[in-house]
Amino acid sequence: MAETGSRLQDTIAQAAMRCFREKGYDSVSVADLCEAAGVARSSFYRVFSSKKDVIRFLFEHTDANSIVSIEELLAAENDFDRMWIIGDRYISLSKELGYAFTATLMSLSLQGEIDLLGLGHSVDAWFIRLTRSCQKNGVILSAEPPERLGPLFVDITYQVLYAWACRRGRYPVRSEARRRTEMLANVAPAYRWSAQQLENADRA
């Protein structure tokens, strides 16, 4: 029995992510995707028009709610750590994909093919609320308006991931993200990571 359109898209998209991660986006053809997904070319073109179309599909079906569990957020000690968990998940996803494919995604975003920046800033409303709570509870000492400060945490994540991709993975992306976020927000000393925690961060 033939797969429904949505199931076929999911099957191809998951196979595509494996192929892109293992071989690199530019080295993978539509034929490779069809073979990996176990579908005919005609089936591929029934639901997608190109490799880029697969990437667009993946981005349209990804948001903060799908990458971070409520259990993780509830287990965090404070709202700053909740913001960190969300931002760090984007870092983890990029490391799982590898620096080369992450660089490809950034390139596609610059070409207007996907909205990488929009995906990250889909959490802005969360970050604004969490920032306001942190300021109220003395975790964040910066007096900048939450509406300005919260979204900057996403920008920091992009900055460090860009540096990591440019340096082919030889960059302390996680510790730099944490250090810069703490500095930007002027996080109270009691809530900052220790030197040992920063050192251990990039071993994960």
Label for each model-derived stretch:
Residues 37-48:
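Short hydrophobic/aromatic patch on the recognition helix
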Residues 8, 51, 62, 66, ...:
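Hydrophobic/aromatic residues within well-ordered alpha-helical segments
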Residues 57, 71-97, 146-153, 181:
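Hydrophobic alpha-helical connector segments
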